[in-house]
Amino acid sequence: MASEVLDIKDRVVLSIKGVNHWFGRHRVLFDVSLDIVRGEIVGLVGPSGCGKSTLLRAIVGTHPPCSGEIRVCSGGPGAGALVRGPGRDRGIVYQQYSLFPFLTAQENVAFGLMVDESSIPYRLLMYPKWRKMRAHHMELAAEFLKRVDLGHAMRLYPGNMSGGMRQRVAVAQALIMKPEIILLDEPFGALDEATREDLQCMLLSLYQENLDARREKRKPPYTILIVTHELNEAIYVGDRVAGLSQWWDWKSEGFDECPGATIVYDRPAPVEEPGGERKYEVYAEQRREIRRTVFDPPGPVDRRRAQTFWEELDNPENRRGVLR
């Protein structure tokens, strides 16, 4: 099993090492480290204001960390590329929909590919080839809209869509670029309960595609980090939960004041098969454990005590989809 764990570490897609971030005298993140493996769907939870969105912006590259490093690994084993700014290897879906109101759903999804693979001079000087390329991009956009159950809405404009439909289009926008990792920043926070459940089922379908790919010895197509304050969502849609919190025992490490939030929880999620039988008592216990450790601890917590994801992989009973 140890050799399998080492092999998994060779498949790390996102590597965060010792990230610190501050704004003036306000310390936000301290020594944040997290490795995410290809094919994982990881939920990142934490109390409001703990720095989840700051960490996400650092991963995206719009707000680089003050110290530490973030790397995205696109190939096999290796150091990976240091994140210095936004790039195609990272896709992001925000809570607020990033759609052009004057484009249809299909055109919105195809737009990123069109911009990435052509230019205005190319369009003007190579118009016949550009038309052929555009037709191909539109076909791909149609495929990805079908994948998120919007095959019937390709010609709708954002103003004619519900909030859930617009968010599905935003997810398809990210998927079509085939990034190494997709980042979801509270993607369902503004939606009603029924719509949230529908979109969670969509994420579970992506999770199932990862499982199917592993069984067929193919590369899992989706690696996702979803930032959310909803514990049920974090546990339900993924195979791993990480917790970021400022309520840890920083005094024992020699600090007079909190140096920022850090990872205090990192464990596998109990649900393995999207359509399989759920052990609700295990699910409920993990929810209580996360709340005690991340959201409402009885006192300062040892930040390393509940970071046991990699150690738990050594136990065959704790193997999750990441090892399939």
Describe each region flagged by the PLM.
Residues 157-161, 165:
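Conserved ABC ATPase signature
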Residues 45-47:
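The feature captures the beta-strand-to-loop junction immediately N-terminal to the Walker
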Residues 60:
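Helix-to-loop junction immediately C-terminal to a conserved catalytic motif
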Residues 110, 114-117, 121-153, 203-208, ...:
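Conserved ABC ATPase "signature" region
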Residues 178:
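Conserved catalytic motifs of ABC-family nucleotide-binding domains
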